[in-house]
């Protein structure tokens, strides 16, 4: 398709450029904006109506005027030059290298606006992904092909958790090719330096592709970045048959950018000012996770978001929870106690956990052990609340054991060092060790055979 150039810029409003008399502009079409001083900037068509093209500019609008500005329509949507050589590299929000390395010699240029995986073509998620974190592996297991978000709050250690998962995540079969695609949106320069240093110093970068968008970068880059990251993941997973873990942070910043652009377009706002199509937009990102029938590759997603005001009913976590398959919740109360990573297992859930655990995946006792730990910890937390009213002296001896179990469970199971990588065997054995402080007769959720084989109770 020939590239057509127009000089009919009628208005500039915030990050948007309005170009008149453009009869055939296409939705998501890429454009080059040529200034009268010779400078060129990129943009993308957000909307077209009656010959008017609304273009979102990548970058500042400084220096762009209605006179002398030429807009060249490329006749194609955004495409990413892609190659296996992207592993070990760091890119900005639109896929340009920012690590001082050479340009990528593309083996292919792929459209970044890929569709969600066709349900008929999907294979059911299965197989365990080990993160090395007990609260996830033991009680909210991540399954290959799943989308499992992390719900956090401002000031909580979700950045450290993201870096730790990226460093430690693995599939148990060492013959499988595994890699991480990491995308960060709207982060500060300090956070960007933290992530790049962590990935480099720990060696995680060698099996990772990083995309970083700073808070000072254009909002449109935050909209494009997750799609670029997922396009990279799809190439590695479905063409190179690798197992890819995609970590996206912070999806709240993504939604804020969506709201900003929607406001600039003067669209009717939905809940709390977010666009009414935010659910659909988020689904086009989350539904790109999964496995394809007849293909050995897979894409597993861990989107991370901060809940404004720690409100889990806020539109961003609320809509994310509808689309994804569970959630891992980082607790402010546990964080105040000095417990890292501070995952609240009672508020967390992995809906696909049963498909990736048990005999042939992790260990035969995994499901029952997790249920027993949930039950014991919940009982201990209930007794904490009761103790605040009646005092510990009013509790029975058995109740006091559950009260102490809750404290021990938080200090030994939920708490672990940033560089502590626990195997699934270590996590399961630790669970049995903690349960040994409770009466064996109370173990109603684990099979007697498993108690006999794995239990740590002393024989009298």
Swiss-Prot record:
Protein name per Swiss-Prot or TrEMBL: A-type ATP synthase subunit B
This protein's GO CC annotations: plasma membrane
Family annotation (HAMAP family): ATP_synth_B_arch (MF_00310)
Keyword Secreted found: no
Main localization (coarse): membrane
Topology within the bilayer: Peripheral membrane protein
Gene Ontology molecular-function annotations: ATP binding; proton-transporting ATP synthase activity, rotational mechanism
Family statement: Belongs to the ATPase alpha/beta chains family.
InterPro entries documented for this protein: ATP-synt_VA_C, ATPase_F1/V1/A1_a/bsu_N, ATPase_F1/V1/A1_a/bsu_nucl-bd, P-loop_NTPase, V-ATPase_su_B/beta
Cited NCBIfam families: PRK04196.1 (NF003235)
Function: Component of the A-type ATP synthase that produces ATP from ADP in the presence of a proton gradient across the membrane. The B chain is a regulatory subunit.
Position of the signal peptide: none
Keyword annotations from UniProtKB, A to Z: ATP synthesis, Cell membrane, Hydrogen ion transport, Ion transport, Membrane, Transport
Compartment annotation: Cell membrane
Gene Ontology biological process: proton motive force-driven plasma membrane ATP synthesis
Quaternary structure (record): Has multiple subunits with at least A(3), B(3), C, D, E, F, H, I and proteolipid K(x).
Transmembrane helix in keyword set: no
Pfam families cross-referenced by the UniProt entry: ATP-synt_ab (PF00006), ATP-synt_ab_N (PF02874), ATP-synt_VA_C (PF22919)
């Amino acid at each position: 398709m020939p590239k057509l150039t127009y000089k009919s810029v009628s208005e500039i409003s915030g990050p948007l450029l309005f170009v008149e008399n453009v009869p055939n502009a296409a939705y998501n079409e890429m454009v080059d904006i040529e200034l009268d001083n010779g400078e060129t900037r990129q943009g993308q068509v957000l909307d077209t109506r009656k010959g008017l093209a609304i273009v979102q500019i990548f970058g500042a609008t400084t220096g762009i005027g209605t006179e002398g500005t030429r807009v060249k329509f490329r006749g194609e949507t955004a495409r990413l030059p892609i190659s296996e050589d992207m592993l070990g590299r760091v890119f900005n929000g639109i896929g340009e290298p920012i690590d001082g390395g050479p340009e990528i010699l593309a083996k292919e240029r792929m459209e970044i606006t890929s569709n969600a995986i066709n349900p008929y073509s999907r294979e059911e998620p299965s197989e365990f992904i080990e993160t090395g974190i007990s609260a996830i592996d033991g009680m909210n297991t991540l399954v290959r092909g799943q989308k499992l978000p992390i719900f956090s709050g401002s000031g909580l250690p979700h950045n450290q958790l993201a870096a730790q998962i990226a460093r430690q995540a693995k599939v148990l079969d060492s013959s499988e090719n595994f890699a991480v695609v990491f995308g960060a949106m709207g982060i500060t320069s300090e956070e960007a330096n933290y992530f790049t240093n962590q990935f480099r110093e720990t060696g995680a970068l060698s099996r990772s592709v990083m995309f970083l968008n700073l808070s000072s970068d254009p909002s449109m880059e935050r909209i494009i970045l997750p799609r670029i990251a997922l396009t990279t993941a799809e190439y590695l997973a479905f063409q190179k048959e690798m197992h890819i873990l995609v970590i996206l942070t912070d999806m709240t910043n993504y939604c804020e950018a969506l709201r900003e652009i929607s406001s600039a377009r003067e669209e009717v706002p939905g809940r709390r000012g977010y666009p009414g199509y935010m659910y659909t937009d988020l689904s086009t990102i989350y539904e790109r996770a999964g496995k394809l029938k007849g293909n050995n590759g897979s894409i597993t997603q861990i989107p991370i978001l901060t809940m404004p005001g720690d409100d889990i009913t806020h539109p961003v976590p609320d809509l994310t929870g509808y689309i994804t398959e569970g959630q891992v919740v980082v607790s402010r109360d546990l964080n105040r106690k000095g417990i890292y990573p501070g995952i609240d297992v009672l508020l967390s859930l992995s809906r696909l956990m049963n498909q990736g655990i048990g005999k042939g995946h992790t260990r035969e006792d995994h499901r029952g052990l997790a249920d027993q730990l949930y039950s014991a910890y919940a009982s201990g937390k209930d007794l904490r609340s009761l103790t605040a009213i009646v005092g510990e002296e009013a509790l029975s001896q058995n109740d006091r054991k559950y009260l102490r179990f809750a404290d021990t469970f938080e200090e030994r199971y939920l708490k672990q060092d940033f560089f502590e990588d626990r195997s699934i065997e270590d996590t399961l054995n630790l669970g049995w060790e903690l349960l040994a402080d409770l009466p064996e007769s109370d173990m109603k959720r684990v099979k007697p055979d498993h108690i006999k084989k794995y239990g740590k109770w002393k024989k009298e």
